[in-house]
Curated annotation (Swiss-Prot):
Gene3D superfamilies: 1.10.8.60, ClpX chaperone, C4-type zinc finger domain, P-loop containing nucleotide triphosphate hydrolases. One of its GO terms (molecular function) is zinc ion binding. PANTHER family: ATP-DEPENDENT CLP PROTEASE ATP-BINDING SUBUNIT CLPX-LIKE, MITOCHONDRIAL, ATP-DEPENDENT CLP PROTEASE ATP-BINDING SUBUNIT CLPX-LIKE, MITOCHONDRIAL-RELATED. The keyword Nucleotide-binding applies. The gene is clpX. ATP-dependent specificity component of the Clp protease. It directs the protease to specific substrates. Can perform chaperone functions in the absence of ClpP. InterPro entries: AAA+_ATPase (IPR003593), ATP-dep_Clp_protease_ClpX (IPR050052), ATPase_AAA_core (IPR003959), Clp_ATPase_C (IPR019489), Clp_protease_ATP-bd_su_ClpX (IPR004487), ClpX_bact (IPR046425), P-loop_NTPase (IPR027417), Znf_CppX_C4 (IPR010603). This is ATP-dependent Clp protease ATP-binding subunit ClpX.
Amino acid sequence: MAEKKGSSGEKTLYCSFCGKSQHEVKKLIAGPSVFICDECIDLCNEIIRDELPAGEDVRETRTDLPTPAEIKATLDGYVIGQEPAKRTLAVAVYNHYKRLRHKEKAKKDDVELTKSNILLIGPTGSGKTLLAQTLARTLNVPFVMADATTLTEAGYVGEDVENIIQKLLQSCNYEVERAQQGIVYIDEIDKISRKSDNPSITRDVSGEGVQQALLKLIEGTMASVPPQGGRKHPNQDFLQVDTTNILFICGGAFSGLEKVIENRTEASGIGFGALVKSKKTRSLTESFKEVEPEDLIKFGLIPELVGRMPVVATLAELTEDALVQILTEPKNAVVKQFSKLLSMEGVDLEIRPSALKAIARKALARKTGARGLRSILEQSLIDTMFDLPNASNVDKVVVDESTIEENKAPLLVYRETAKKA
């Protein structure tokens, strides 16, 4: 019976499965002529969960993990080009979080999946940092960026490597469980390379010393972090964070690595009978494609650290066409940002194609990659943006090639002129 009449004449509803009345349970859910209580629902869930095999298809159990194609599609919205790097990153990150799902359900005798940290190599301004930031936004996981140049060995002035984990905890409001599945991006990893190929007899506290300190953190260790960001002192309770499941992405420009690669790939003999080879001038992109672990070790990374970053993604130098795309296409493109700024003054911004190419050429000459685009456009518009708030009848600002190349003032189209035209 799902319902009975009480002494007062009111109908009392009962669970069709366990027979408890609506007053004995928190919730009673009605179906067609039947009812089920919250306790029976919980019991059914437990039975289903227990009977689900450990090797069940991941697609059935995952709810919030995007596929590699979905991850790459999000990256495409913010980062122009760099297709191989985006594909490598998407697959590596997807496999990492798939591994975590597997670990939660795996039996003792099951295959153990190990972590694959990532190393991004590419010239300055090619999109390494932007890729990592967009990745974290896509996955909705705790994310922190650390600068390797500020790190020193424990006991010296500077940041300890454990400060990175402290920042990760801060980013997720000190939820240890969430932090243990986050992403850490360590920028400028090439700046902590040791100063010579041979181990030094003097102490290198910001180079090889930091690499040694990063080893266990990247591989997986229990890091002791002071609660709420305080300083370490004796008799203090520490938060214990297991870094085994934290994905580490390291990035760097590795300026000079191309010479190490060329010396290895274009080695020629000496003496009268040796074959004389002419040195080919190769681009950074071509050189970085041939990078091997031995090149990174020769550059100054210690072998143990190179071994802990098995996934290496190289980013290409940006071409003129790619820089023009970066100016206009991404969701947060520089041109869109300046158009928005001028629209707040009631003014339209038109940047002609010849001007876009001129900006790209100038950025290439500066060798600053995509970072140089904003400063070039800002420089061209600074005087106009200074005068615009006081001008009441400007309808449009037009930037052409001469504005960029010859530093001429942009063309101002006034409302009266616009109406006549």
